[in-house]
């Protein structure tokens, strides 16, 4: 079967077609980074309007890339939440409309389940059970995963997500939006140990995170030490090391608590090379395995939605023709497949 996936939850328009026998047949992506750069962050109204302009042309491009026509599509999956309500409504409206016109099922997909399942698109997909670290601009969560829809939240950020903290700290360092990848690049030139940032909430039991204090610590460090290039790089290094160490410490605890031997890392921040290297080293010492998607599937994309839609469709999930989205949607509320 072939599923068309539509992703419009924030500032990327992603369209993909997934075949359960042949794999990914098409993958189209348009990023709105340049549109929002002057504002230092995503402007919801601008994001929604740009999705309106880009979604249908990208669907046409995906069909052309795959060599398919509408008659070859067996289902349409779309991100129904969580995300920006206006952006979600664009994808949901287009998805439901196409499903009606093509007389195929419409499948609402949870955005974070899409991220969680993105490593399944790789040649060496993880087997259940595993601990999942979902780490992005909007979420930082540790989840026990024993099957599709069998998700137990172990811990999450009580304030800023890790990706949000990266972007905010990057802005303090004078970097453009989105600053997370630029901060990591700057950190590679930094001197380890010149500055030492705290590892929030690692001195107490539990698996929750807190990253807002690191931004404040960075602001104070910048104020007290100036902004020459090397100092900025050293601060970036200290910040990144603190975030990576914190995530690693919490992952260790989650693995100890569950007894699982596999760790899956997903979401935009999972593309961070330092984080990947540290977690790979940690899992090697534990004689376990770590899995993640290729970098282009770490950030928002249509491929993960098409794949998650296929999984949910096979489990019997479909929707009526009403258009509804859930800007806030806990992952634990999803039914088991």
From Swiss-Prot:
Q: What class of enzyme is it?
A: transferase
The GO terms this record gives for MF are:
glycosylation-dependent protein binding; identical protein binding; iron ion binding; magnesium ion binding; N(6)-L-threonylcarbamoyladenine synthase activity
A Pfam family reported for this protein in Swiss-Prot or TrEMBL: TsaD
SUPFAM superfamilies given for it?
Answer: Actin-like ATPase domain
Q: Which cofactor does it need?
A: Fe(2+)
Q: Name one GO cellular component term.
A: EKC/KEOPS complex
Q: How is the cofactor bound?
A: Binds 1 Fe(2+) ion per subunit.
Q: What happens when the gene is disrupted?
A: Appears essential for growth, since no null mutants can be obtained. Conditional depletion of this gene prevents t(6)A37 modification, and leads to pleiotropic phenotypes including increased or reduced cell size, unusual distribution of DNA around the cell periphery, nucleoid loss, and membrane/cell envelope defects. These phenotypes could be indirect effects of severe translation defects. The TsaD depletion phenotype is suppressed by overexpressing the response regulator RstA.
User: What are the record keywords, sorted?
Assistant: Acyltransferase, Cytoplasm, Iron, Metal-binding, Transferase, tRNA processing
Binding-site positions, substrate: 134-138, 167, 180, 272
PTM entry text: Can be proteolytically processed in vitro by TsaB.
Q: Which of this chain's residues are annotated to bind Fe cation?
A: 111, 115, 300
Location comes to: Cytoplasm
Assigned EC number? 2.3.1.234
What sections of the sequence does the record tag as coiled-coil? none
Tell me the GO BP annotations in alphabetical order: maintenance of translational fidelity; tRNA threonylcarbamoyladenosine modification
- Reactions catalysed, as given in the entry: L-threonylcarbamoyladenylate + adenosine(37) in tRNA = N(6)-L-threonylcarbamoyladenosine(37) in tRNA + AMP + H(+)
Q: What else is known?
A: TsaBCDE are necessary and sufficient for tRNA(NNU) t(6)A37 threonylcarbamoyladenosine modification in vitro in E.coli.
- NCBIfam families according to UniProt: gcp_kae1 (TIGR00329), T6A_TsaD_YgjD (TIGR03723)
Q: Which family does it belong to?
A: Belongs to the KAE1 / TsaD family.
**Oligomeric state and partners?**
Homodimer. Interacts with TsaB; may form a heterodimer with TsaB. Also interacts with TsaC.
Its biological function? Required for the formation of a threonylcarbamoyl group on adenosine at position 37 (t(6)A37) in tRNAs that read codons beginning with adenine. Is probably involved in the transfer of the threonylcarbamoyl moiety of threonylcarbamoyl-AMP (TC-AMP) to the N6 group of A37, together with TsaE and TsaB. TsaD likely plays a direct catalytic role in this reaction. May also be involved in the metabolism of glycated proteins, but does not show sialoglycoprotease activity against glycophorin A.
Q: How is this protein named in the record?
A: tRNA N6-adenosine threonylcarbamoyltransferase
> What organism, scientifically named, is this protein from?
Escherichia coli (strain K12)
